Amino acid sequence: MTKKDKKAKGPKMSTITTKSGESLKVFEDLHDFETYLKGETEDQEFDHVHCQLKYYPPFVLHDAHDDPEKIKETANSHSKKFVRHLHQHVEKHLLKDIKTAINKPELKFHDKKKQESFDRIVWNYGEETELNAKKFKVSVEVVCKHDGAMVDVDYKTEPLQPLI
């Protein structure tokens, strides 16, 4: 398969319908996730999106020489080094890539929260913005757990109703 054939395919994802009837897209690859967001922005469907990404951060795969079997057991929320590197990855790469994908490089994610418990760390990022005269809220939740290096990202956009 040539690179051209690979690019012709859409992002690899699965669609799940939640109990409340909401359609949820689930990704296992960061690149596919970003490609999907870019496509939704181009299709004008950007203000009502809910998708999840479950992946190993690039710095973890790099340390394991791109072999998930070689990921150290210490790469989890109990490791200060892992948490520090993950936070840097989220702030400097993931959020930046999301801004680029939805064509909003000036997005700042002012609404930031961090919740820590014994078994997980959760970072929440949120911001209200506007694109093509549509106001919407972007929410990103990043979770790392105590039992592995897999990171869960929950990306959600909701339209904001104008006040009348």
Curated annotation (Swiss-Prot):
GO CC terms, sorted: cytoplasm
Coiled coil: none
Keywords, ordered alphabetically: Cytoplasm
Note: Present with 5530 molecules/cell in log phase SD medium.
Purpose: Involved in the control of energetic metabolism and significantly contribute to cell fitness, especially under respiratory growth conditions.
Family: Belongs to the RGI1 family.
Protein name: Respiratory growth induced protein 2
Native source organism of the sequence: Saccharomyces cerevisiae (strain ATCC 204508 / S288c)
Lineage of source species: Eukaryota, Fungi, Dikarya, Ascomycota, Saccharomycotina
Gene name as annotated: RGI2
